[in-house]
A protein has these predicted regions:
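Short linear motifs embedded in intrinsically disordered, charge-biased segments
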Residues: 1-207
Length: 207
């Protein structure tokens, strides 16, 4: 494998910062705390709020540039505006959502960012005091968190169908040794979408 040493970075993911020294042909590889991969910021501390905020900022910037051209255009049909939102805006906010754990904070951030665009599409503001559920119903849009939960479930089913020697399948079914630290544990990926009905579905798949 050939790599570009000037473009290659190394990063460790751990609770406490770790020093990682890699040398390729007498050239040290720079260690970083954060880097961008396919438009997504990945940090060594794995802060889901920080990573998601970067995606939302990009989606908001694009949505703002379309405000006068598309969202507030009285000559464009609402369903066309919604189709543009689904195609151009939502994928930016939800990129990698299938493998990211959700917290109360990240769910709130996604819903706020989505409703900001949907209110503009529907020609409403907060002063109109229209419920978010009513605006989503008028636009024919499913709640972004529920939509993401379905994507997680689809990814879970996809990984379960993989061979047992595939890395995603190994990671999904692996239980790391040791115990979790005291206090409230970090949110796990499975905790983001499992509920009573979903756990029942999981048991049926295992059987």
């Amino acid at each position: 494998m050939n790599i570009s040493i000037s473009k290659t970075k190394c990063m460790t993911i751990a609770k406490d910062p770790l020093r990682c020294k890699l040398v390729v042909e007498d050239n040290p590889i720079e260690q970083v705390m954060q880097f961008r991969y396919l438009g997504v910021d990945i940090s060594s501390t794995h802060d889901p709020v920080k990573d998601l905020r970067s995606q939302i900022n990009k989606a908001s910037a694009l949505s703002g540039s379309l405000r006068d051209i598309v969202w507030s255009n009285p000559y464009m049909r609402k369903d066309s505006k919604v189709r543009i939102y689904k195609t151009c805006i939502r994928p930016i906010m939800t990129y990698g959502m299938e493998v990211r754990e959700d917290t109360v904070k990240t769910k709130h951030m996604l819903r706020v960012a989505e409703m900001k665009t949907l209110r503009t599409i529907g020609g409403k503001t907060k002063r109109d005091r229209v419920r978010n559920t009513d605006i989503r119903e008028q636009c024919g849009i499913q709640d972004i968190v529920r939509w993401g939960r379905q994507r997680k479930r689809q990814w879970y089913n996809h990984v379960r169908r993989m061979d047992e020697n595939r890395l995603p399948r190994i990671v999904l079914e692996n239980n790391p040794p040791g115990s979790r630290p005291p206090g409230r544990p970090p949110k796990r990926w499975k905790d983001s979408w499992q509920s009573t009905s979903q756990e029942e579905m999981q048991r049926q798949l295992q059987n």
